[in-house]
Amino acid sequence: MKELIEFMARAIVDYPDEVEVTEENTEDQIVFHLKVAESDMGKVIGKQGRIANAMRTLLKVAAIRKGTKASLEIG
């Protein structure tokens, strides 16, 4: 799932080398933290958060297929 987030983020940013995804396991879910260049933050979030919501939806689908829960924090 980490690779999925990296792939999606690198496809839309201007500085793909600065994309960083970290993973934090909690008791009931996996929390992914996505960091991008300051100038790419708007592209990752999108108008009214549409890109961010789409990325979160795809992540949740992948997590359900693996039998777990996952969330994405962008910042």
Question: What is each PLM-predicted segment?
Answer:
Residues 1-43, 54-75:
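RNA-contacting regions in translation and RNA-metabolism proteins
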